[in-house]
Amino acid sequence: MAEVGGVFASLDWDLHGFSSSLGNVPLADSPGFLNERLGQIEGKLQRGSPTDFAHLKGILRRRQLYCRTGFHLEIFPNGTVHGTRHDHSRFGILEFISLAVGLISIRGVDSGLYLGMNERGELYGSKKLTRECVFREQFEENWYNTYASTLYKHSDSERQYYVALNKDGSPREGYRTKRHQKFTHFLPRPVDPSKLPSMSRDLFHYR
């Protein structure tokens, strides 16, 4: 028990240290620093079970991610990302990991993969927590959130690449997105254990 408690304390310290250290360092100018910190955080997250994560008090949130196009975002074990209209789907239960003020990573509870965006703006599931898996979470005026890549954007206009789902639930490439499009607007919805099938409750450690 003491060892587990030490992991939590260390993780909490690492995340707060990461936040303060990042404060005056532009992400684009510090790839080595950011990669090192993400590796440290990922290692500590992997030591605990999903049940243990409940002790992290706001650092990690378990949510569904609902898009204005009518779909919940899912991360599948084979690394594909898609949307579903099914509420509380197995692969739509996600963990939101707060890395710093306004910076998050998103991981599928069942798949264990992190949401990532590559240089072409394509969404995918990553086994490792890398810079492609860090997004800037912004609260918009219409009460929805947007999630922008911290690594990729249009070189000419500086317009950011956003996480987005099309009207058919397919992922929309980041280079085709704009902040005020409904494709890019999401609501993090809380998970209701009573709506999960019994098998899923055991899988996600809900009793």
Curated annotation (Swiss-Prot):
- Biological process according to GO: animal organ morphogenesis; cell-cell signaling; fibroblast growth factor receptor signaling pathway; neurogenesis; positive regulation of cell population proliferation; positive regulation of endothelial cell chemotaxis to fibroblast growth factor; positive regulation of MAPK cascade; regulation of cell migration
Presence of the UniProt keyword Glycoprotein in the record: yes
Phosphoserine is found on 111
Main location (coarse class)? secreted
Q: Which residues does the annotation flag as glycosylated?
A: 78
Its GO CC terms are: cytoplasm; extracellular region; extracellular space
Q: Where in the cell is it found?
A: Secreted
Q: Which Gene3D superfamilies match?
A: 2.80.10.50
User: What UniProt keywords are attached to this protein's entry?
Assistant: Disease variant, Glycoprotein, Growth factor, Phosphoprotein, Secreted
Q: What does this protein do?
A: Plays an important role in the regulation of embryonic development, cell proliferation and cell differentiation, and is required for normal cardiomyocyte proliferation and heart development.
What disease is recorded for this protein? Metacarpal 4-5 fusion: A rare congenital malformation of the hand characterized by the partial or complete fusion of the fourth and fifth metacarpals. The anomaly occurs as an isolated trait or part of a syndrome.
SUBUNIT field? Interacts with FGFR1 and FGFR2.
- Identification of the protein by name: Fibroblast growth factor 16
- What organism does the record attribute this protein to? Homo sapiens (Human)
